[in-house]
Swiss-Prot record:
Its main location: cytoplasm. The keyword Lyase does not apply. SUPFAM superfamilies: Elongation factor Ts (EF-Ts), dimerisation domain, UBA-like. It comes from Shewanella sp. (strain W3-18-1). The gene is tsf. This is Elongation factor Ts. Keywords: Cytoplasm, Elongation factor, Protein biosynthesis.
Amino acid sequence: MAISAAQVKELRDRTGAGMMDCKKALEETNGDMELAIDNMRKSGAAKAAKKAGNIAADGTILIKNGEGFAVLLEVNCQTDFVAKDANFLGFANSVLDVAAASKVALEDLKAQFEEARVALVAKIGENINVRRVEYIDGAKLASYRHGERIGVVVTGDADDETLKHIAMHVAASKPEYVNPEDVPADVVTREQALQIEISMNEGKPADIAEKMVVGRMKKFTGEISLTGQAYIMEPKKTVGEFLKEKGAKVTNFIRLEVGEGIEKKEEDFAAEVAAQIAASKKA
């Protein structure tokens, strides 16, 4: 049976697949449109299953403000090339819109967009993963995206410009907590034990070692907290001092970076070439 251009166009419009894939699917089903769609969906699911084991550590961070809250979303792919692809970004923004509409939980988002994800994997040829969604509440919010890879939202009592600058600082300096006193007790205890051991190994007298540990702990909690860090725009001041001058306060923040915490496969190009040469000699 001859397949018409109109049939190919209809299948392409309905599936988003490539023209040649659509033509082939229609030829295999003798022009049966619905069967062609079913077969393409099955094929796409199989391709997605094969890609599921591939490490997806690239991608994008998106942010959208709602009423009294903001949502940050991370969607991953395997390469920076696909991270800029219009189809990938369209998918990610669709997920973001649904998340922002009603604070949808991550697992529910994954389930809702699984069919679209599978179709996208089949079309693009890379593993795609809706990895994280975070919500932050606040009457006053400021957001900042550094390129496509880092997203920050800060909430607090301050003017828009001040909160925006603090969001930029968070993007650059990666604080883990708002204030030094917010550092959890178990984190403090673990670091304190380490510093005591270091001081003892240095052979310091007990009274001096104790003072050294106090100083080091103050530095430690300051470096991992927002208000204790040196402010990137005025390094002689801490963020806390800058906020005090402005009569401002930060109550919370969220920072997401693409791929953080994902163990990536290290590519050794020289070893790969050597292996290929060795294999060719055996052939």
